[in-house]
A protein has these predicted regions:
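A mature extracytoplasmic/lumenal domain signature
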Residues: 41, 75, 141-143, 170-172, ...
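Glycine-centered secondary-structure boundary/capping sites
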Residues: 56-60, 242, 300
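Residues at secondary-structure transition points
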Residues: 45, 181, 238, 293-294
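Contiguous, structured surface segment used for ligand recognition
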Residues: 12-134
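N-terminal leader/propeptide and maturation segments of large enzyme subunits in energy/redox metabolism
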Residues: 289-294, 299-300
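Bacterial Sec-dependent N-terminal signal peptides
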Residues: 1-14
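Feature activates predominantly on carbohydrate-active enzymes
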Residues: 80-285, 299
Length: 300
């Protein structure tokens, strides 16, 4: 179904998401072996070097053609924070933005156009900026653990689509997926199992792996928002530390935290202290999920 919407837009212009404004020109720019990629200093130089490498790794420089791609981080206060301009002419390409995020999005747009045209980028002028400040993708790793390399692939796809918030669902009923040093049983016991197999070997991220992924996301202007699910869907926690379990019923055993024990709030506070230290995001998602599979304390 998505293709029914995407293909007509790509007939007009192959960039996705559809940019705010496009003016098509004449001719095209060829990504060649003698290509020069330049920045105007600082972050633009760093991004230019990365773009040169990405174009080479994508195998797009088969032609002997020359040309210049310039990345310009400008002080133009008229440009919105994440906005960019991309001007493609037969002999040159200009990427311009007033913020690092905007210039990064211009680079991603150019890569997308280059891959679509297999090294040929048709002449155009694109002026674009996001319609929404929060452009997110959620990944549930409690039910299905993917691992560090797969998460990085998702982050690369997010960057290509100019998404900027990675909502990381790391805890739920099937398993706990983040190392908390103060509570080791969260990973030795709580990380055992997944949605399909409750006895699957423990899988989780160490704190060093979390830091690596957060840094990888930051390089792509993506904020990572972790989720510590509570007070419901706390099964993985409560089977590891049953003293804070609020009980459950039927197949939903240990579904909630116990709301009437001081130890519960001490546990939550200590866990949040470690999570906050790992994630620079101003936001931590705490779920707020249902508690109807619990003891009667929740109804008083």
């Amino acid at each position: 179904l998505l293709l029914l919407f995407v293909l007509p837009m790509m007939a007009q212009h192959p960039l996705f998401p559809t940019p705010a404004k496009v003016q098509n020109g004449k001719g095209s720019f060829v990504i060649g072996k003698n290509l020069q990629v330049q920045g105007n200093g600082g972050y633009a130089d760093k991004l230019a070097a990365g773009l040169q490498t990405e174009l080479k790794e994508a195998g797009l420089q088969s032609s002997p053609a020359s040309g210049t791609i310039r990345l310009d981080l400008t002080n133009d206060c008229k440009m919105a924070d994440e906005a960019y301009t991309l001007v493609v002419e037969p002999n040159s390409i200009l990427l311009q933005a007033s913020s690092e995020a905007g210039l990064f999005y211009a680079k991603e747009a150019l890569l997308q156009l280059s891959r679509f045209g297999k090294g040929n980028v048709r002449a155009c002028k694109i002026q674009d900026q996001p319609r929404y400040g929060w452009r997110g993708f959620m990944l549930d790793e409690s039910r299905h653990f993917f691992g560090k390399e797969k998460v990085k692939q998702y982050l690369d796809i997010m960057a290509s689509l100019r998404l900027n918030v990675f909502h990381w669902h790391l805890t739920d009923e099937p398993g706990w997926r983040i190392e908390i040093k103060r509570y080791p049983k969260l990973t030795t016991e709580g990380a055992v199992g997944n949605w399909h197999d409750p006895k699957a070997p423990a899988t989780f991220y160490t704190q060093e792996e979390i830091k690596e992924i957060v840094a990888y996301a930051a390089d792509r202007h993506i904020m990572v928002v972790p989720e510590f699910d509570m007070p419901g869907h706390a099964t993985a926690v409560c089977r590891s530390y049953p003293e804070i379990s609020g009980g459950g019923e039927g197949k939903w055993q240990h579904f909630t935290f116990h709301p009437c024990k001081e130890e519960t709030f001490e546990f939550i506070s200590n866990v949040l202290d470690e999570i906050v230290a790992l994630f620079p995001s101003p936001y931590i998602h705490i779920g707020g999920d249902e508690v109807h599979y619990g003891n009667q304390s929740w109804f008083t």
